[in-house]
């Protein structure tokens, strides 16, 4: 079992992001101290304003020196930093690999050099059914965690793997919401496609559940419900489209790196084979 200890220092890579902010709040609430490294200086400043006690370090996990500086005096690591936009990863393969593979390797090696108690990494269902660069880099990251677990048994290496988090940074939902509020046309890839979704609170809950219950570095996977892209868009239009406006959709088809249906486990069910959220449930979530 791994848990947050009072006054111990925890490194959160990518802490300026959507998931990072929620995780940092939980760590602080449990009495821990936080240092975070991220590339987005503007978001780091906002984080510092909200949580003055957090030590911020503008930097890049792909830069070994930056990781060395961030890792000093750390007791545990939450590795969130990633290049995670599926479409951009196809065009920026080098950048995606630098962040998700080289950056992860830097974090793991410096964690060993500093003898931390644990390293927990965030993966994705895209690693279970690889269709593009992003999923491939996350799969490699998972394998690195497993090898480090085998080679350095005094440190706990853990991986959580799940689907999409509602309104995460770069999510198309943020764009859809604004377009719908203005009664504008919404571009959608494939309404019949299905995806695993849940809330930011559930995502952070899984991180702590993994710390408490996972026994090795194999991906720690939750049971998740799914929704179709069409149902999600219907729920959003019912909630955000002004009265008197009709839903205007332009369908463009699946893009490079995307699957019609996702899996969380390689031998698990596709997202169109599991329990679905109802429109009402989706509206409550969004």
Predicted regions and their residues:
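Conserved glycine-rich Rossmann-like NAD(P)H-binding loop of the short-chain dehydrogenase/reductase
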Residues: 32-44
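Residues in the short beta-alpha loop(s) of Rossmann-like NAD(P)-binding domains
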Residues: 40, 125, 225
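Strand-loop microenvironment adjacent to phosphate/nucleotide-handling motifs in alpha/beta enzyme folds
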Residues: 143-286
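NAD(P)H-binding glycine-rich loop region in Rossmannoid oxidoreductase-like domains
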Residues: 49-55, 61-98
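Conserved residues in the N-terminal Rossmann fold of short-chain dehydrogenase/reductase
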Residues: 38, 57-58, 98, 251
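N-terminal Rossmann NAD(P)H-binding glycine-rich loop of SDR-like oxidoreductase domains
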Residues: 10-30
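A short, basic/flexible loop-to-alpha-helix module at the beginning of a structural domain
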Residues: 1-7
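Conserved Rossmann-fold NAD(P)-dependent oxidoreductase catalytic core, especially the SDR/UDP-sugar
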Residues: 79, 83-87, 91-142, 147, ...
């Amino acid at each position: 079992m791994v848990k947050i200890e009072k006054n111990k220092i925890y490194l959160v890579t990518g802490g300026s992001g959507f998931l990072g902010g929620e995780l940092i709040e939980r760590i602080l609430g449990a009495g821990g101290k936080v240092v975070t490294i991220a590339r987005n200086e503007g978001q780091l400043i906002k984080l510092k304003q909200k949580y003055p006690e957090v030590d911020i370090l503008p930097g890049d996990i792909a830069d070994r020196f930056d990781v060395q500086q961030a890792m000093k005096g750390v007791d545990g690591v939450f590795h969130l930093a990633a290049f995670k936009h599926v479409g951009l990863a196809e065009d920026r393969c080098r950048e995606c690999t630098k962040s998700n593979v080289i950056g992860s390797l830097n974090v793991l090696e410096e964690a060993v050099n500093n003898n931390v108690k644990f390293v927990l990494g965030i993966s994705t269902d895209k690693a279970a059914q690889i269709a593009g660069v992003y999923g491939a880099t996350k799969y490699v990251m998972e394998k690195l965690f497993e090898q480090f677990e085998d080679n350095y048994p005094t440190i706990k290496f853990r991986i959580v793997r799940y689907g999409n988090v509602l309104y995460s940074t770069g999510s198309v939902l943020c764009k859809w919401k604004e377009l719908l509020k203005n009664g504008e046309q919404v571009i959608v890839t494939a309404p019949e496609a299905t995806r695993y979704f849940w809330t930011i609170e559930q995502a952070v809950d899984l991180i702590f559940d993994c710390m408490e219950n996972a026994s090795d570095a194999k991906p720690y996977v939750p049971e998740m419900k799914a929704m179709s892209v069409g149902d999600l868009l219907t729920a959003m239009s019912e909630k955000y489209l002004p009265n008197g406006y009709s839903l205007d959709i332009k369908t463009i088809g699946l893009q490079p790196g995307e699957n019609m249906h996702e899996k969380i486990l390689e031998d698990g069910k596709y997202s169109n084979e599991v329990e679905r959220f109802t429109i009402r449930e989706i509206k409550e979530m969004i």
